[in-house]
């Protein structure tokens, strides 16, 4: 992690604050490609490469970015977020490669290295016909060579995969009862010899946020590369971005070939993969890899059958492999994770001391995920460094009071809620997920959304995706609507209590 002292400009300090607040993993996934484009007296113009990133950041973090900017710059400005050209960035990153390939290919026709290099780098020729009298032939070759090089560059950029966090290895993964099977399966996949037949294929890991899916996937990718396997790790967002870029640069064939000739494909956050063309391409890629005996590893926040927006063929193929859940972290595992994270923090901040009873309190009381535990330790570190107050149990209780969970609720699945509500109101599951607006469907659907919000740990956007890909505002409207009706209608309140009990017993 960068030290705060290295951030000299307001924008660098904003990025540093975001990294510290949300963690390196999430920062790398969502904010690493966000750029500061323009700064005026009243506005900050930021940009990201995709509409998906723009939508997610606007929905979840834009107000926070504005607040941090005001704090770090001393001036309150409006923060705007735009989408920059979807494929200019990877091409720019590969500019030298493109230039070299084009020069090499045109040289075969012109025989003059310096003249062709000048044409590529300067975008012009010194003479309409060229010094050797063959200028028109060379110019005819250049667009074809440039297009071929551009195709190679885009495909290579995707095949190189999403960036890996150096901290996410098998050695740093803390194993407990809730994740031991997933860890063992992931390790066996990663350690299989190049060319050997996959044992678990595909390997499908699912869990709620912050329980270790990404950690295991990146560990597989890193170990596979070290072991000599051609391994590519991609987030679903990166896969979508690469496919769109390939279409725009007419390099779809190169894109497909780049992915279908690797040994191991690792896809993270599959629940974000949307769009018929994208799903069709993923389906073809998945089939090509599996049929060719190559390893596929996928992670999502739900079971394959619950990915309602995905094609049924994809869900069926994913369900046909080894499906493993990383369950909620048990208290003993939470304590071990805290000890490991604390050890890392003490190496970075030697004066930071947390007594064992405080770590035990955090393990017993805070959150449901590794990220919750990270947040709690970071709060203690901030309190300690900003106030100079030593970490005690009393100080910890005050510092992390907003992170303390009242009880450990039984985990309820959205699938269970859909089944219970559909049966109770005599409608089908398909009705609840459909776009139908009849009264016999709308009210049960809203009640199901309300129950999903009150009985599960899923966010509004996650619930929306599970209900036929709806927007989070639709879920919020349903929750508020039913909440208001429950307060005014005693019969409905009792009915919902019955549904809650049925869902908890499912």
UniProtKB/Swiss-Prot annotation:
Oligomerizes as a right-handed, spiral filament on DNA at oriC. The keyword DNA-binding applies. Residues 103-112, 121-142 have a biased composition (Basic and acidic residues). It holds the Pfam family DnaA_N. Domain I is involved in oligomerization and binding regulators, domain II is flexibile and of varying length in different bacteria, domain III forms the AAA+ region, while domain IV binds dsDNA. Plays an essential role in the initiation and regulation of chromosomal replication. ATP-DnaA binds to the origin of replication (oriC) to initiate formation of the DNA replication initiation complex once per cell cycle. Binds the DnaA box (a 9 base pair repeat at the origin) and separates the double-stranded (ds)DNA. Forms a right-handed helical filament on oriC DNA; dsDNA binds to the exterior of the filament while single-stranded (ss)DNA is stabiized in the filament's interior. Keywords: ATP-binding, Cytoplasm, DNA replication, DNA-binding, Lipid-binding, Nucleotide-binding. This is Chromosomal replication initiator protein DnaA. It is found in: Cytoplasm. GO terms for biological process: DNA replication initiation; regulation of DNA replication. InterPro entries: Chromosome_initiator_DnaA, Chromosome_initiator_DnaA-like, Chromosome_initiator_DnaA_CS, DnaA_C, DnaA_dom, DnaA_N_dom, DnaA_N_sf, P-loop_NTPase. Residues 1-77 are annotated as: Domain I, interacts with DnaA modulators. Residues 103-142 are annotated as: Disordered.
């Amino acid at each position: 992690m960068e030290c705060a002292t290295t951030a000299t400009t307001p924008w660098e300090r904003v990025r540093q604050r975001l990294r510290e607040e949300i963690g390196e993993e999430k920062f790398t996934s969502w904010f690493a490609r966000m750029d500061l484009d323009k700064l005026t007296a009243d506005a900050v113009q930021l940009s990201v490469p995709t509409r998906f990133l723009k939508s997610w950041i606007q929905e979840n973090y834009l107000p926070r970015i504005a607040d941090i900017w005001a704090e770090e710059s001393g001036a309150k400005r409006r923060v705007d977020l735009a989408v920059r050209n979807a494929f200019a960035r990877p091409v720019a990153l590969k500019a030298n490669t493109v230039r070299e390939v084009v020069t090499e290919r045109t040289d075969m026709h012109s025989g003059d290295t310096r003249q062709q290099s000048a044409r590529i780098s300067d975008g012009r020729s010194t003479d309409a016909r060229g010094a050797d009298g063959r200028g028109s032939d060379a110019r005819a070759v250049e667009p074809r060579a440039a297009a071929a090089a551009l195709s190679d560059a885009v495909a290579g950029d995707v095949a190189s995969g999403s960036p890996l966090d150096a901290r996410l290895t098998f050695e740093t993964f803390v194993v407990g009862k809730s994740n031991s099977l997933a860890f063992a399966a992931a390790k066996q996949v990663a350690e299989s010899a190049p060319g050997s037949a996959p044992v678990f294929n595909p390997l499908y890991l699912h869990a709620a946020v912050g329980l270790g899916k990404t950690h295991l996937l990146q560990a597989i990718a890193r170990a596979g590369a070290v072991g000599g396997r051609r391994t590519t790790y991609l987030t679903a967002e990166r896969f979508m971005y690469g496919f769109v870029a390939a279409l725009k640069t007419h390099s779809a064939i190169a894109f497909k070939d780049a992915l279908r000739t690797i040994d191991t494909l690792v896809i993270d956050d599959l629940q974000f993969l949307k769009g018929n063309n994208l799903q069709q391409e993923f389906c073809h890629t998945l089939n090509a890899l599996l049929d060719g005996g190559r390893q596929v590893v996928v992670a999502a926040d739900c079971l394959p059958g619950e990915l309602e927006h995905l094609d049924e063929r994809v869900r069926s193929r994913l369900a046909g492999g080894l499906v493993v859940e990383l369950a909620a972290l048990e208290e003993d595992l939470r304590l071990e994770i805290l000890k490991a994270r604390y050890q890392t923090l003490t190496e970075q901040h030697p004066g930071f001391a947390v007594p064992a009873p405080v770590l035990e309190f955090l393990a017993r009381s805070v959150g449901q995920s590794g990220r919750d535990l990270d947040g709690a330790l970071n709060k203690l570190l901030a309190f300690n460094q900003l106030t100079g107050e030593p970490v005690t149990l009393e100080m910890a209780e005050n510092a992390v009071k907003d992170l303390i969970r009242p009880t450990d609720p039984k985990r309820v699945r959205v699938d269970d809620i859909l089944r219970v509500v559909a049966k109770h109101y005599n409608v089908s599951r398909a009705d609840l997920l459909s776009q139908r607006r009849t009264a016999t469907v709308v009210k049960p659907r809203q009640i199901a959304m309300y129950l999903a919000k009150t009985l599960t740990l899923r966010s509004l956007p996650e619930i929306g995706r599970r209900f036929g890909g709806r927007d989070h505002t639709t879920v919020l409207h349903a929750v508020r609507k039913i909440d208001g009706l429950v307060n005014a209608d005693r019969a409905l309140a009792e009915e919902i209590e019955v549904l809650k009990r049925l869902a908890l017993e499912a």
